Amino acid sequence: MAKKIIGFIKLQVPAGKANPSPPIGPALGQRGLNIMEFCKAFNAQTQGVEPGMPIPVVITAFADKSFTFVMKTPPATYLIKKAASITKGSAKANTDKVGKITRAQAEEIATTKRPDLTAADMDAAVRTIAGSARSMGITVEGL
């Protein structure tokens, strides 16, 4: 028989830097889950990832106080900012452009994000990434 699910917890945790402090501790603690067990398992799974890269994670909490978690791909905004070599997007995206990325960089980001995107094909995924970049005040060359 399947375990009874008591809830899902969605967090963004820096790769390799999960610790019991907020936001992880309170989110897991209120459901009675072992915080250190999650931190050790998450840090072990993110060893090959660039340290500090935000990784979205969905934790499934079960009634017997056990859990499983699924890691998603890093946020598109993080990957776009990294490709454009900027620290933050524009406050006025339509008027102030803060950087630019090429179509090749957008394709690379789309390839990374593909498992989490709902795009039907690669071209649609690239257009999705380009739209995110434009909303951050970053121009996409070759699109």
Curated annotation (Swiss-Prot):
CDD domains: Ribosomal_L11. The keyword Repeat does not apply. It comes from the Bacteria. One of its GO terms (cellular component) is cytosolic large ribosomal subunit. One of its GO terms (biological process) is translation. One or more lysine residues are methylated. Keywords: Methylation, Ribonucleoprotein, Ribosomal protein, RNA-binding, rRNA-binding. The keyword Transmembrane does not apply. Pfam families: Ribosomal_L11, Ribosomal_L11_N. Gene3D superfamilies: Ribosomal protein L11, C-terminal domain, Ribosomal protein L11/L12, N-terminal domain. GO terms for molecular function: large ribosomal subunit rRNA binding; structural constituent of ribosome. Belongs to the universal ribosomal protein uL11 family. Part of the ribosomal stalk of the 50S ribosomal subunit. Interacts with L10 and the large rRNA to form the base of the stalk. L10 forms an elongated spine to which L12 dimers bind in a sequential fashion forming a multimeric L10(L12)X complex. HAMAP family: Ribosomal_uL11. Forms part of the ribosomal stalk which helps the ribosome interact with GTP-bound translation factors. PANTHER family: 60S RIBOSOMAL PROTEIN L12, LARGE RIBOSOMAL SUBUNIT PROTEIN UL11M. This is Large ribosomal subunit protein uL11.
